[in-house]
């Protein structure tokens, strides 16, 4: 399994200079609000994805007194790989993998598959289909090598088609060549998504069944993949039927860019019926299902970044999550203001493989002496 064995952070937010040597299992990061513990998770995300899970404005990632930040990671997966990323305030970005220049963040993502769960993850239930589609496509991207090719082709066709739709007096015949290419790409995308979703759905239902609250619900919790067009007909023919509507709006209404993963209780969106704690359990089950399908199909396990996991989870459900992560075998980075709930709930007090880090005013300190853990339990 891929694990991050070393992390060097320079001028990233309030972390002026920090070096971490994480363990291959649980890495627990504690600290007060604003101390910088979430920034550690964020730096790993930027290093692995090329982007932050907190902001789209990269200048906010650079320490106020500096003109750039630099991140370096050492990944072990049978052999050691070195990855690095630097970003300057003028927008310049440098990515290096094993001392060679890389051109896209996709190459980083392939080195270190990463799942990030934080407060924004509630958008998987509260947000639009785009949020869930992006979440699910992470899995399809990693387990189906051809997906990237067909998605890029599809995106190019949609962009060109929408551009033509906004032109004066566009005819159906002018769109036809693009529609044919769009249809081919969409069929491949839907085929791959459907195949992966069968596995995902099975694992999700198994994982959510571990939480007791599902037995008290008045209806069955379901997870369904919904295509972006009607499955009763040909996509190309449906594009033709939508022509006048698309011209009037200036964009394409149906297609793989409109697909969704629905989480319902009976026929009602689950978010409208479940408590905040129950929603958190559903979100955990979604992430665990992704990780399990990823492991089943690739033989690898993703790295988990869990920001303030204990929030909204009671002791029993937190224990269920800890057991599932242990069985999965993933490397985990988890933050908590008070690590007591994780230490006790996950039975980590005497675990010699645990790495504990404490962050204060941007300074990171290793708290790995097993005798020190009792101080967090007082």
Curated annotation (Swiss-Prot):
GO MF assignments: ATP binding; single-stranded DNA binding
Keyword list, A-Z: ATP-binding, Cytoplasm, DNA damage, DNA repair, DNA replication, DNA-binding, Nucleotide-binding, SOS response
A biological-process GO annotation: SOS response
Highest rank taxon of the organism: Bacteria
SUPFAM superfamilies for this protein: P-loop containing nucleoside triphosphate hydrolases
Location in or out of the cell: Cytoplasm
Ranges in coiled-coil conformation: none
Keyword Metal-binding: no
Residues where ATP binds: 31-38
Annotated GO CC locations: cytoplasm
Keyword Glycoprotein appears in the UniProt entry: no
Any single Pfam family the record assigns to this protein: SMC_N
Family named by the database record: Belongs to the RecF family.
Function: The RecF protein is involved in DNA metabolism; it is required for DNA replication and normal SOS inducibility. RecF binds preferentially to single-stranded, linear DNA. It also seems to bind ATP.
Protein name: DNA replication and repair protein RecF
Species: Teredinibacter turnerae (strain ATCC 39867 / T7901)
Gene: recF
């Amino acid at each position: 399994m891929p694990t991050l064995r070393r992390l060097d952070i320079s001028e990233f937010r309030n972390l002026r200079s920090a070096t971490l040597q994480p363990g291959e299992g649980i890495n627990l990061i504690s600290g007060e609000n604003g101390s910088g513990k979430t920034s550690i998770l964020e730096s790993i995300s930027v290093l692995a994805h090329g982007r932050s899970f907190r902001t789209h404005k990269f200048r906010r990632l650079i320490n106020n007194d500096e003109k750039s930040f630099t991140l370096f990671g050492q990944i072990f997966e049978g052999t050691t790989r070195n990855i690095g990323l630097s970003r300057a305030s003028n927008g310049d970005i440098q990515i290096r993998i094993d001392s060679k220049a890389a051109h896209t963040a996709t190459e980083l993502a392939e080195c270190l598959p990463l799942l990030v769960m934080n407060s924004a993850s509630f958008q998987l239930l509260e947000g639009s289909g785009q949020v869930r589609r992006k979440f699910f496509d992470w899995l399809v991207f990693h387990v189906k090598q051809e997906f990237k090719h067909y998605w890029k082709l599809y995106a190019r066709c949609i962009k060109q088609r929408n551009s033509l739709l906004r032109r004066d007096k566009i005819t159906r015949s002018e769109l036809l060549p693009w529609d044919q290419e769009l249809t081919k790409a969409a069929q491949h995308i839907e085929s791959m998504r459907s195949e992966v979703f069968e596995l995902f759905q099975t694992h999700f239902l198994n994982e959510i069944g571990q939480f007791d609250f599902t037995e008290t619900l008045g209806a069955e919790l379901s997870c369904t993949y919904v295509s972006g067009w009607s499955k009763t007909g040909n996509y190309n023919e449906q594009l033709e039927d939508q022509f006048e509507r698309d011209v009037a709006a200036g964009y394409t209404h149906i297609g793989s860019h409109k697909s969704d993963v629905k989480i319902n209780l009976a026929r009602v969106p689950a978010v409208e019926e479940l408590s905040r704690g129950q929603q958190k359990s559903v979100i955990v089950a979604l992430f665990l299902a992704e990780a399990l399908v990823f492991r089943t199909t690739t033989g690898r396990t993703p790295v988990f970044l869990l920001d303030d996991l204990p929030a909204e989870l009671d002791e029993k459900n937190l224990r269920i999550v800890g057991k599932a992560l242990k069985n999965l075998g993933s490397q985990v980075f988890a933050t908590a203001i008070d690590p007591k709930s994780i230490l006790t709930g996950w039975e980590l007090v005497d675990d010699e493989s645990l790495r504990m880090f404490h962050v204060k005013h941007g300074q990171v300190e290793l708290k790995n002496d097993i005798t020190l853990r009792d101080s967090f339990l007082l």
